[in-house]
């Protein structure tokens, strides 16, 4: 059921960080309520990219995406960027009204840049505001005790979102008395 209080969490895995030359290879989404309880999860979608695109990845991406199995999933996938965008958009629309939720995640501006370029319908559907968990991590480093949330960093889109939600819960309890 749709609610303007629900939050849209998205994570992307890309072939690199340069929005002009790199591509999205995986997208996942989770919807939570405002108290960060998970309402629904969209299965992660591996997005097909050509061997030319995959071969242009830097060493870090090659290593990590190979270890997680994502590179092979991308090669095997028949799903285009446009089809993945449509699937995720349909998922989001079930739970969140148009432009009512900020885009939520860790270092979410980087994902937002890729969404704006390659999945503009999702970008437009989300409110222009963003809820970036990284901000609280940095505030804890600067003004808190510096003891942060321990992350596994699996670099799998759905796992990364779950971890971001858990991290926000951690910092909400630790830093915010609201």
Curated annotation (Swiss-Prot):
Entry GO terms, CC: cytoplasm
Highest taxon of the lineage: Bacteria
GO biological process, one term: DNA metabolic process
CDD domains: Orn
Keyword Nucleotide-binding: no
The protein's name in its UniProt record: Oligoribonuclease
Subcellular location: Cytoplasm
Species, as recorded: Francisella tularensis subsp. novicida (strain U112)
InterPro entries xref list: Exonuclease_RNaseT/DNA_pol3, Oligoribonuclease, RNaseH-like_sf, RNaseH_sf
Record-annotated Exonuclease domain positions: 7-168
Enzyme active site: 128
Entry-linked SMART domains: EXOIII
Function comment: 3'-to-5' exoribonuclease specific for small oligoribonucleotides.
Keywords of this entry: Cytoplasm, Exonuclease, Hydrolase, Nuclease
HAMAP family in the record: Oligoribonuclease
First-level EC class: hydrolase
Main location: cytoplasm
Any one Gene Ontology molecular-function term assigned to this protein's record: nucleic acid binding
